[in-house]
Amino acid sequence: MKPGKYTDRYTAEDVRAYRDAGLWGDETMFDLLTIQAEQRPDKVFATDGHRSLTYRELHDSALRLAAGFHARGWRAGDAVAVHLPNWVEFIEVVTALSRLGIITVPIMPIYRRDEVGYVAGHAEVRAVVTPATFKGFDYLDMYRDVRRERPDLEILVARPDDAARAIANEAGSGVDLLDDVRTDAAADLPAQPSADDPFLIVYTSGTTSR
């Protein structure tokens, strides 16, 4: 299931009214970050107790990630699941995806095999960004199980442990490390998406996650 354009849900009159009221604009998420990176580059934007990022650091880091994602063949309109705790990597990844017009599918950290299997299939995600482990749970092992049903699923691991590094070194594992994706070749990025392009698919946190 891939989302359509906003015109599938809103009439032309709705769109004009929202724009006239200033509720809708033409800036993308990355546009807004770029403005802040220029105006307050050294101000801390996010911290998680392990890492902190200023506006400029987030901007530059997201560009490097976006270049790495693009080099992997990820393109506008693709969907990528982001199954991370409240880490700064979550913000980096979502910002990088937004720069490319790739649709973020955030998954709550408490979701397990049944829920993530459904979301990954229903949203037709091509990849997932996940921890190796978090609070005693092995996320990487779970997604390797999902990959048995979806052998094309790419798995990127944030903050890997030694076991995750070893798996990433195995030929054909489908597992890579997020930090290894970063590149400095940001100049080759495609044009930015429109503010009207799909950006996010959110699944409910109800009893079925469906």
What are these regions (language model features)?
Residues 71-72, 95, 99-178:
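Structural core segment of the AMP-binding/adenylate-forming
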Residues 23-26, 34, 42-95, 112-117, ...:
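Conserved AMP-binding/adenylate-forming core of the ANL superfamily
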Residues 74, 78, 102, 209-210:
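Short phosphate-binding/catalytic loops that engage adenosine nucleotides
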Residues 6-10, 14, 31-54, 160:
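AMP-dependent adenylate-forming
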